[in-house]
Amino acid sequence: AIMRMSGEGPTFDANTECAIAYHHTKYQVEQGTAQLYAGDDMAQDTTPILKPSFRLIADRIELKSKEVTHTQVPGEYATFCGWCVTPKGIIKEPRKLFASLQLAKHIGKTAEVKTNYAHDLAHAYRLGDELQDVLTPDEAAFHQATVRDLVTMGGVDFQWHP
């Protein structure tokens, strides 16, 4: 197998390169498809289409993927490292961001995390009313609660641009 084990030299970079090569060998990736890779994790904003030619070599490749397909509708977007891959761009998963902020409040670490959490939230906040197109009612409630908490804490800027 090509994939490297955790703790070995350039594990992350090697795993990322292998994941990209494997994915593009197995699937037809249309031009304009948004793709994210990190180590052995990946996501894309469209449903992968298996290349017929992959069946000819599949039994000779030890690397196997753990595939999860999402319908790319509110509540069912592909996720990647805590981010939802939506038609409007990436947004931090509202429930996870809310839970992380609540934990920070509980352990007294809000001063250390509020700016980073505001930066994470900014991707969704900047969508304005369009955010309602990509969130479920529950996700919208978590988003609103996180915005409210961060505004109440003060000193945060949701208009941050990466």
From Swiss-Prot:
Question: What EC number(s) does its UniProt record assign?
Answer: 2.7.7.48, 3.6.4.13
InterPro entries hit by this protein: DNA/RNA_pol_sf
Question: Which GO MF terms does the UniProt record name?
Answer: ATP binding; ATP hydrolysis activity; RNA helicase activity; RNA-directed RNA polymerase activity
* Keyword ATP-binding found: yes
Q: Which reaction does this chain catalyze?
A: RNA(n) + a ribonucleoside 5'-triphosphate = RNA(n+1) + diphosphate; ATP + H2O = ADP + phosphate + H(+)
Lipid metabolism in keyword set: no
The alphabetized UniProt keywords are: ATP-binding, Helicase, Hydrolase, Multifunctional enzyme, Nucleotide-binding, Nucleotidyltransferase, RNA-directed RNA polymerase, Transferase, Viral RNA replication
Q: What function does this protein fulfil?
A: RNA replication. The central part of this protein possibly functions as an ATP-binding helicase.
- Which family, according to the similarity comment? Belongs to the potexvirus/carlavirus RNA replication protein family.
Q: What is this protein called?
A: RNA replication protein
Give the originating organism: Lily virus X
